[in-house]
Amino acid sequence: MNATGTPVAPESCQQLAAGGHSRLIVLHYNHSGRLAGRGGPEDGGLGALRGLSVAASCLVVLENLLVLAAITSHMRSRRWVYYCLVNITLSDLLTGAAYLANVLLSGARTFRLAPAQWFLREGLLFTALAASTFSLLFTAGERFATMVRPVAESGATKTSRVYGFIGLCWLLAALLGMLPLLGWNCLCAFDRCSSLLPLYSKRYILFCLVIFAGVLATIMGLYGAIFRLVQASGQKAPRPAARRKARRLLKTVLMILLAFLVCWGPLFGLLLADVFGSNLWAQEYLRGMDWILALAVLNSAVNPIIYSFRSREVCRAVLSFLCCGCLRLGMRGPGDCLARAVEAHSGASTTDSSLRPRDSFRGSRSLSFRMREPLSSISSVRSI
């Protein structure tokens, strides 16, 4: 049907689709009920919600830029943890940038986009969210494998494997996000279209939901196993310091699981209801979709706090980066700022130097296994 509610001839819809005309987006939005109460496609007022969305996306971008700059410039360690942190930060940075572009191209600008541009706008956000989720899955898998299989592995082999899995994460995320652009959509098949994302097929959304639900369930299962391993290690530890370390790890795992449930649960529930619900239901909860999507994107702002600032090494890197920036600008902050920066540099050098004897142990037959096992099982997990 068209904007006035009269049916649209299939041949005219196909002609619009073949020509990539923006009028096709108006037809799909009108059929799904998204134009109800808007005053027409030229009504672009989003008000305070749009401002909050822009602020949230800018927060995600700036926060991840800060962590990325600090990690790459002030962390000397190049273990697998380093590459996982960089990968998670990059994916969260892309999530914030994609969400910002999505918000700025929404409203009245939506109806000036060609269908391919609309698919690119939404697909980029799907790709970024998928890359962030797959990166968290890879990190959880590496962390679990390091705990249950503390076997010596050459640095080159480990690095190649990490690079391979990171590349696979991004390849799968890009493929998942661009499937509608490649043809899995519902152009001119209005009965198969989503109500919340009018050009997306309900089957495609259900496919994404199954994948994301499987990934998140796997992540929670891995962290549940890590929780039990760390709890068992803490109970067996005879020293108070080891027990405190185990409790710190337990708190980190609980924070990760809670962040996933709070940030991702509402979005999955909304999309699942969209697949099996009606257009009337979608119209009623349309405004809630914007808030729920913003909540999911805010998970990319929570990730640097959980994964980075719970690590003393990354905390030192961020503090050193900020203090060095202030000193370059000639700003003298609190008296302990310079002292903390010096401490951060000395701590990083100490960490770096402590890794060198570990390499020499690899050449020693008598100390080859027992000296590395505790470092692989506990301290590598603690560093995220």
UniProtKB/Swiss-Prot annotation:
<dbReference type="GO" id="GO:0005739">
    <property type="term" value="C:mitochondrion"/>
</dbReference>
<keyword id="KW-1133">Transmembrane helix</keyword>
<dbReference type="InterPro" id="IPR004061">
    <property type="entry name" value="S1P_rcpt"/>
</dbReference>
<comment type="similarity">
    <text>Belongs to the G-protein coupled receptor 1 family.</text>
</comment>
<dbReference type="GO" id="GO:0007189">
    <property type="term" value="P:adenylate cyclase-activating G protein-coupled receptor signaling pathway"/>
</dbReference>
<comment type="function">
    <text>Receptor for the lysosphingolipid sphingosine 1-phosphate (S1P). S1P is a bioactive lysophospholipid that elicits diverse physiological effect on most types of cells and tissues. May be involved in cell migration processes that are specific for lymphocytes.</text>
</comment>
<feature type="transmembrane region" description="Helical; Name=1">
    <location>
        <begin position="51"/>
        <end position="71"/>
    </location>
</feature>
<dbReference type="Pfam" id="PF00001">
    <property type="entry name" value="7tm_1"/>
</dbReference>
<dbReference type="GO" id="GO:0007186">
    <property type="term" value="P:G protein-coupled receptor signaling pathway"/>
</dbReference>
<feature type="topological domain" description="Extracellular">
    <location>
        <begin position="1"/>
        <end position="50"/>
    </location>
</feature>
<keyword id="KW-0807">Transducer</keyword>
<feature type="glycosylation site" description="N-linked (GlcNAc...) asparagine">
    <location>
        <position position="30"/>
    </location>
</feature>
<feature type="topological domain" description="Cytoplasmic">
    <location>
        <begin position="310"/>
        <end position="384"/>
    </location>
</feature>
<keyword id="KW-0449">Lipoprotein</keyword>
<dbReference type="InterPro" id="IPR004064">
    <property type="entry name" value="EDG6_rcpt"/>
</dbReference>
<keyword id="KW-0675">Receptor</keyword>
<dbReference type="GO" id="GO:0038036">
    <property type="term" value="F:sphingosine-1-phosphate receptor activity"/>
</dbReference>
<protein>
    <recommendedName>
        <fullName>Sphingosine 1-phosphate receptor 4</fullName>
    </recommendedName>
</protein>
<dbReference type="GO" id="GO:0004930">
    <property type="term" value="F:G protein-coupled receptor activity"/>
</dbReference>
<feature type="transmembrane region" description="Helical; Name=3">
    <location>
        <begin position="118"/>
        <end position="138"/>
    </location>
</feature>
<feature type="topological domain" description="Cytoplasmic">
    <location>
        <begin position="228"/>
        <end position="252"/>
    </location>
</feature>
<keyword id="KW-0297">G-protein coupled receptor</keyword>
<feature type="topological domain" description="Extracellular">
    <location>
        <begin position="106"/>
        <end position="117"/>
    </location>
</feature>
<feature type="transmembrane region" description="Helical; Name=4">
    <location>
        <begin position="162"/>
        <end position="182"/>
    </location>
</feature>
<dbReference type="GO" id="GO:0019222">
    <property type="term" value="P:regulation of metabolic process"/>
</dbReference>
<dbReference type="GO" id="GO:0005886">
    <property type="term" value="C:plasma membrane"/>
</dbReference>
<feature type="topological domain" description="Cytoplasmic">
    <location>
        <begin position="72"/>
        <end position="84"/>
    </location>
</feature>
<keyword id="KW-0325">Glycoprotein</keyword>
<dbReference type="InterPro" id="IPR000276">
    <property type="entry name" value="GPCR_Rhodpsn"/>
</dbReference>
<dbReference type="GO" id="GO:0005737">
    <property type="term" value="C:cytoplasm"/>
</dbReference>
<keyword id="KW-0472">Membrane</keyword>
<feature type="topological domain" description="Cytoplasmic">
    <location>
        <begin position="139"/>
        <end position="161"/>
    </location>
</feature>
<feature type="glycosylation site" description="N-linked (GlcNAc...) asparagine">
    <location>
        <position position="2"/>
    </location>
</feature>
<feature type="lipid moiety-binding region" description="S-palmitoyl cysteine">
    <location>
        <position position="323"/>
    </location>
</feature>
<dbReference type="GO" id="GO:0008289">
    <property type="term" value="F:lipid binding"/>
</dbReference>
<feature type="transmembrane region" description="Helical; Name=2">
    <location>
        <begin position="85"/>
        <end position="105"/>
    </location>
</feature>
<keyword id="KW-1003">Cell membrane</keyword>
<feature type="transmembrane region" description="Helical; Name=6">
    <location>
        <begin position="253"/>
        <end position="273"/>
    </location>
</feature>
<feature type="topological domain" description="Extracellular">
    <location>
        <begin position="274"/>
        <end position="288"/>
    </location>
</feature>
<dbReference type="InterPro" id="IPR017452">
    <property type="entry name" value="GPCR_Rhodpsn_7TM"/>
</dbReference>
<feature type="transmembrane region" description="Helical; Name=5">
    <location>
        <begin position="207"/>
        <end position="227"/>
    </location>
</feature>
<feature type="topological domain" description="Extracellular">
    <location>
        <begin position="183"/>
        <end position="206"/>
    </location>
</feature>
